A protein has these predicted regions:
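N-terminal amphipathic/basic leader segments beginning at the initiator methionine
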Residues: 1-21
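Alpha/beta enzyme core
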Residues: 13, 26-31, 37-327
Length: 327
């Protein structure tokens, strides 16, 4: 039998397989999510996220050093305040937990690139992502507090802001506020297509942000919808977003691919807490090879079109990339 085309030729040895890889990744594309809790001398494990911790601002340096040693130089900060109220006023407090954390990191590790999550759910006493009018989130009133929060983060030293609230018009509101205060070069990474997903459970435990009533389907996207994601991304581009994001990642690889193909902005994907927790639990139970599944799932997200990956596995993935196992 004569065969002139034999795909196996390019799979014959590891050196050759690495040379012809179609998807190339590096630690420069990784962002590590980090939880800051108000207080002092705190490092507490997060039961729902094996291997992850909440840090007070005075101890966050421990995790920053660990990230830098692993080759990860970008973090995404989430805050857990001591005080919560109806309007989430701790979110834009100049001495709030995120603002303290930003200053603490930048003072000691100016090379660390800091992205901050901009939302209200961790700061409101009702756990919803904005200002309530009855039992509904008032979209337009929420825009003002989101913009104030983003500005307070940038004034504290944040390099980039990432609004995750899913209010209509938030990118335009934040962009205008930052520009008006002279921060025209501060980029916005928008949670553009953020779905109302069941995969967020461990995060809500970690951040203490579960809604006190109802759910978030009135503002986060319906998992049934594909075209709506394109509309959300297009609106964010029009309003001035610099980076688009799809969240979650693994169950929405089709959305990552379509948005990546359709728009010329960098595409981020957030491999969320539920994805991480499932891999950790299955690995601990001996059902899967945790390391290989971690690498394979991350690779699938990049292959779908993501340029940036936000993941709790960032440090482990950076090592795999540096050793040539991935990318």
């Amino acid at each position: 039998m004569e065969m002139s085309i034999r795909p196996r030729r390019l799979r014959s040895c590891e050196n050759l397989r690495r040379m012809v890889r179609e998807t190339r990744v590096s630690p420069e594309s990784l962002i590590y999510p980090l939880f800051l809790i108000e207080g002092e001398n705190i490092k507490e494990p997060i039961p729902s996220l094996d291997g992850q911790y909440r840090y007070s601002p005075d101890r966050v340096w421990e995790e920053i050093e660990s990230c830098l040693a692993a080759g990860v130089s970008r973090v995404l900060l989430f805050g857990i305040p001591a005080h919560k109220d109806a309007c989430g006023s701790s979110a834009w407090d100049p001495n709030g937990v995120v603002q303290q954390g930003i200053r603490a990191i930048k003072e000691k590790y100016p090379q660390m690139y800091i992205v901050t999550d901009v939302c209200m759910c961790e700061y409101t006493d009702h756990g919803h992502c904005g200002i309530l009018c009855g039992h509904n989130v008032d979209n337009d009133k929420t825009l003002e507090v989101l913009a104030k929060t983003a500005l307070s983060h940038v004034e504290a030293g944040a390099d980039m802001v990432a609004p995750s609230d899913m209010m209509d018009g938030r990118i335009a509101a934040i962009r205008e506020t930052l520009d008006d205060h002279g921060y025209v070069n501060t980029p916005i990474m928008s949670y553009s297509a953020k779905y109302a997903s069941a995969f967020y459970g461990p995060f809500r435990d970690a951040a203490g942000s579960a809604p006190a009533f109802g759910d978030r389907r009135g503002y986060q996207m319906d998992p049934h919808n594909r075209k709506e994601a394109m509309k959300e991304c297009a609106l964010d581009v029009e309003e001035g977003a610099d980076i688009l994001m799809v969240k979650p990642a693994l169950s929405y690889l089709d959305i990552i691919r379509e948005c990546s193909d359709a728009f010329d902005l960098p595409m981020a994907a957030y491999s969320v807490s539920g994805e991480y927790a499932m891999i950790k639990a299955a690995g601990k139970a001996g059902l899967i090879d945790e390391h290989r599944v971690m690498c394979e799932s991350a690779l699938s997200i990049y292959r779908a079109g993501a340029n940036i990956l936000i993941t709790y596995f960032a440090k482990e993935l950076a090592k795999a990339m540096q050793e040539g196992e991935l990318g």
